């Protein structure tokens, strides 16, 4: 029986390309090579596609995916040249141009099956402002917030923050993930510099009420109504703010899996996670991040449509705790991708 082709797209144009490479390397090592051949394509910061490596067996420990200068010495290809009949694409891409619907639309034009969110779920979860409106509509609780726009009067935005929120607040670009461009602001004097930093990444910004809370995460897997959620895990930090470097570079966090919460609270988190996932028409996978306060209030922080996927990332570890290994999780995601593709193609008839 011939092997199936799994195409890994990694790198990308966003500030989160380093996370993408780490995730893609983990996937290439964990793939079931009795079932798959893995072909890898690097997307440069400029958006160019480069065919890099091909694996028919588990790579050696020291083998790395080609990136940056090394990859760019390879010939560039037309993006459409990644097409291969019956292949499944795993877009291991984070942030803009990766989990915002852009690459998903491109893959649908090519009529390729792909792992993860569709155009709608990717774009709606990537945009923090739009996502907040959707989650409000279905009754999933969130912390108070103020929307800010780069072309508006910044003094008026500051006044709205003073009237509606209490410091500390968190300033977040609306269309970015992995804590890139996010600042914790403890007083009014620091608000404008934080907004200026966020505007580097998006002209639309969310200013959220800070809460003294535990950070609890829940992994979701499935398509349509057939959706499963894990027992939650907890992010335990050695730093005051769980920023990009503490997440991926400095290793200043640890995770408790499963989280030490009551059965009732775990069930509430699972139900909110599934409700949020279905509200944005989730497909394949998502990681839903929550705040849980000392008095038991639960607030949805965000839904990550393509969560970090290294072998030490929360998403696969949550499923491992439920008895689904990293390698089996990848196979399940491929099967879900093929199911979604078949449904989409049938709807076009």
From Swiss-Prot:
- Where is the protein localized? Cytoplasm
Binding site residues for ATP: 162-217
Top EC group: ligase
List required co-factors: Mg(2+); Mn(2+)
Q: List the disulfide bonds.
A: none
Name the catalysed reactions.
2 D-alanine + ATP = D-alanyl-D-alanine + ADP + phosphate + H(+)
SUPFAM superfamilies under this entry? Glutathione synthetase ATP-binding domain-like (SSF56059), PreATP-grasp domain (SSF52440)
Checking Pfam families in the record gives: Dala_Dala_lig_C (PF07478), Dala_Dala_lig_N (PF01820)
Provide this UniProt record's keywords sorted from A to Z: ATP-binding, Cell shape, Cell wall biogenesis/degradation, Cytoplasm, Ligase, Magnesium, Manganese, Metal-binding, Nucleotide-binding, Peptidoglycan synthesis
Q: List residues binding Mg(2+) 1.
A: 289, 302
Q: Which family does it belong to?
A: Belongs to the D-alanine--D-alanine ligase family.
Query: Per its UniProt record, what NCBIfam families does this chain match?
Result: D_ala_D_alaTIGR, PRK01966.1-4, PRK01966.1-5
Task: Supply the name of the protein.
Answer: D-alanine--D-alanine ligase
Species lineage, top-down? Bacteria, Bacillati, Bacillota, Bacilli, Lactobacillales
